């Protein structure tokens, strides 16, 4: 089971990504279901695919680990990062992963999604329109 929280609500509530009780605060804050909730990840799905299957429109662009539009922070649980991706080691060491190519391997995980406003992540964003023009016949 993945418990998720939208990074954009942190500033509104005076919270920080490093807060130990971040998810307890979110549970008590009466947030919208798109900002805080839970869903299951099927074994063959990435985190992004699972979010979409559950009706959520999380940010992404390339779906291949070449940008940080889909970056998430793993607050609790295990979510290994595949070898091929754009994230520098200092971000992966902080628990940052790309939801388009990774999935939790622990039974439970706490994930903060929508990290595009985090300065270290925003430097590696790509415009989604760059990928919208690609097709399978290209």
Curated annotation (Swiss-Prot):
Domain of life: Archaea
Keyword Metal-binding recorded: yes
Coiled coil: none
SUPFAM superfamilies according to UniProt: 2Fe-2S ferredoxin-like
One MF annotation (Gene Ontology) recorded for this entry: 2 iron, 2 sulfur cluster binding
Alphabetical list of Gene3D superfamilies matching this protein: 3.10.20.30
Key words of the record: 2Fe-2S, Electron transport, Iron, Iron-sulfur, Metal-binding, Transport
Pfam families hit by this protein: Fer2 (PF00111)
Cofactor note: Binds 1 [2Fe-2S] cluster.
Residues the record lists as binding [2Fe-2S] cluster: 62, 67, 70, 100
Protein name as annotated: Ferredoxin-2
């Amino acid at each position: 089971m993945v418990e998720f929280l939208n990074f954009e609500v942190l500033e509104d509530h005076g919270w920080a990504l490093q807060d130990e009780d971040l998810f307890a605060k979110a549970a008590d804050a009466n947030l919208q279901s798109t900002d805080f909730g839970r869903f299951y990840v099927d074994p063959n799905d990435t985190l992004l695919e699972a979010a979409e299957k559950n009706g959520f429109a999380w940010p992404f662009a390339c779906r291949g680990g070449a940008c940080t539009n889909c970056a998430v922070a793993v607050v609790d649980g295990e979510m290994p990062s595949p070898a091929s991706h754009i994230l520098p080691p200092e971000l992966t060491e902080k628990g940052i992963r790309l939801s388009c190519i990774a999935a939790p391997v622990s039974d439970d995980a706490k994930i903060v999604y929508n990290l595009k406003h985090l300065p270290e992540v925003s430097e590696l964003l790509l415009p989604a329109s760059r990928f919208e023009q690609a097709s399978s016949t290209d």
